[in-house]
Amino acid sequence: MTILNHTLGFPRVGLRRELKKAQESYWAGNSTREELLTVGRELRARHWDQQKQAGIDLLPVGDFAWYDHVLTTSLLLGNVPPRHQNKDGSVDIDTLFRIGRGRAPTGEPAAAAEMTKWFNTNYHYMVPEFVKGQQFKLTWTQLLEEVDEALALSHNVKPVLLGPVTYLWLGKVKGEQFDRLSLLNDILPVYQQVLAELAKRGIEWVQIDEPALVLELPQAWLDAYKPAYDALQGQVKLLLTTYFEGVTPNLDTITALPVQGLHVDLVHGKDNVVELHKRLPSDWLLSAGLINGRNVWRADLTEKYAQIKDIVGKRDLWVASSCSLLHSPIDLSVETRLDAEVKSWFAFALQKCHELALLRDALNSGDTAALAEWSAPIQARRHSTRVHNPAVEKRLAAITAQDSQRANVYEVRAEAQRARFKLPAWPTTTIGSFPQTTEIRTLRLDFKKGNLDANNYRTGIAEHIKQAIVEQERLGLDVLVHGEAERNDMVEYFGEHLDGFVFTQNGWVQSYGSRCVKPPIVIGDISRPAPITVEWAKYAQSLTDKPVKGMLTGPVTILCWSFPREDVSRETIAKQIALALRDEVADLEAAGIGIIQIDEPALREGLPLRRSDWDAYLQWGVEAFRINAAVAKDDTQIHTHMCYCEFNDIMDSIAALDADVITIETSRSDMELLESFEEFDYPNEIGPGVYDIHSPNVPSVEWIEALLKKAAKRIPAERLWVNPDCGLKTRGWPETRAALANMVQAAQNLRRG
């Protein structure tokens, strides 16, 4: 029983973000479709070869996507919303781009499909749309073409296909409501056709991804798996693939399926591999996801070996990444600015392939010397002073319940804040950032590259802050912001100023489409060596008599949008960040800043996949926010901003944050989101977003007034604020001025009654 290895997928974008550049060039009309397709072919060939050279036995094919793999599956099945279809009914790459981004070099623009988080990762997928009576047919043969490409290059190919039940689970019904699971029998013939085509090509194994099997699914959905896979059996061997959590709760459903193998995530799941082995059919292959596909840390291969060795020789076994390596940067070797010690702690996608090769060889031979050598830096890290800060650990241990309580309840605080700020009814503000012009970005880049000295940089930033204050005063806003000209990214900026973080040069991972992010890496205990935002907030406040908000990114969001440590809990990291930012709140307050906003857009997306695990997460997530904010005096007003499409299921926790004001994204839902706050009888103040900042469209005064009147039917007017949905960083100044002018006018009209 020779053990093989494989990956579940590989990063698509290229080491230098070649795919992103090719996409954006094509969208802008600066290159041809054939040039774009050539870049895709070159990247696929390179990535297969890189994995092979690193020692991978079975190469994933079908993991590449021009925008998103769920969208690729929609096209495969012929699921193209009518508004995005070509007039002749054909499907091409521009069809795909119109669904993903609302426009393409050809065809008519139309509203893009909804985008949402892929399970609990920072990757986004395009939500499939389903209508009653929908027809499906094999339409987009990208998978088959890429399999042909890989076979022509003499690779050992394992196609990757998103499974039918998970595909339906991820979608939404449009128009007349019906049970989307009823479409299962309509999409299965397309899956059968695809598997038949793969069998014709001599494919032995197909990786069929069903990550929905790690969720607490309704019984009807669990029951759907057996008939679905009864219909798919027989043409090729199926590796039923799960990830991001364990499978034990749904194992009875899984073991009844006519598949030939199962992949389990042994990093993020709590499954015991020996117990799994006992419960799986004896002729099934087990693919053990031992190498973390969604973090950047070098694996302790001696530990991984010990985890799996007891079942070696007892069944067919593969070793694998826990999930697709899509969520990891590509290659650590090109990082030249990380010092040797820190660099030795990491493994990016290519290094993870090497780890799988080392693990496979050791399991086949019994010789673990190479594993011990690889794991040595991990042992050294456990005692590094760069990881452990006794002062931080001592402070964390000393936290009491009092540290997460404001001095008085909201009603007492609100009175003190009204006396201090004397704001009018319907107070107007913005969420924080103003347009990041080419001039601002160039200023920051020149300073970062050393082409601009600190004095000239500070003078430039000060000028942009001054301009933002002048613009806001001219518009008549009531509570101002400094505009965040000095910030490149709301998480990276804080990470750069906190001890315990490091940054990469090329650690890009795909977020969606052509958007890539470069998350900070938490390497050790987190502390704040000096004030971060105080200087610019204080300067902005000196320019006006109106209150200027201090702007902080909250602890849970910084955690969720970074690569976290694996040697301590997420709760520990969040509370360390909270303590560091608590000092920032105190310093802002001492500098005369009376309104402080702590953004937590990631609070909801950090929820565990299983609802039964939510309470524990929400408890420490809320506590981290409160530790951050509770140092504020009664007359300091704490704001928070959140952008979710769903509040109902976490309203208790949102109220428990005890922010004086919460601003939320509501314009696209026509204020429907306020239902949650109305039903809950939310006690504090709310700023429902009155226009969508993701659109360049300028809302009319009448439209904003109508939205606010609608809001006032749900929430008492004396507790309502007036603000956009989100920050204005990506907008231009002309539409920003026009939209804010109309927003202020609408508020003034309402004050006059």
Curated annotation (Swiss-Prot):
Binding locations of 5-methyltetrahydropteroyltri-L-glutamate: 17-20, 117, 515-516, 561, 605
Transferase as UniProt keyword: yes
Presence of keyword ATP-binding: no
GO biological process, one term: methylation
Protein residues bound to L-methionine: 431-433, 484, 599
GO molecular function, one term: 5-methyltetrahydropteroyltriglutamate-homocysteine S-methyltransferase activity
SUPFAM superfamilies: UROD/MetE-like (SSF51726)
Chemical reaction(s) catalysed: 5-methyltetrahydropteroyltri-L-glutamate + L-homocysteine = tetrahydropteroyltri-L-glutamate + L-methionine
Annotated catalytic residues: 694
Database matches in InterPro entries: Cbl-indep_Met_Synth_N, Cobalamin-indep_Met_synthase, Met_Synth_C/arc, UROD/MetE-like_sf
Organism superkingdom: Bacteria
Binding site for Zn(2+): 641, 643, 665, 726
Role played: Catalyzes the transfer of a methyl group from 5-methyltetrahydrofolate to homocysteine resulting in methionine formation.
Family (UniProt): Belongs to the vitamin-B12 independent methionine synthase family.
Protein name: 5-methyltetrahydropteroyltriglutamate--homocysteine methyltransferase
Organism: Shigella flexneri
Source species taxonomy: Bacteria, Pseudomonadati, Pseudomonadota, Gammaproteobacteria, Enterobacterales
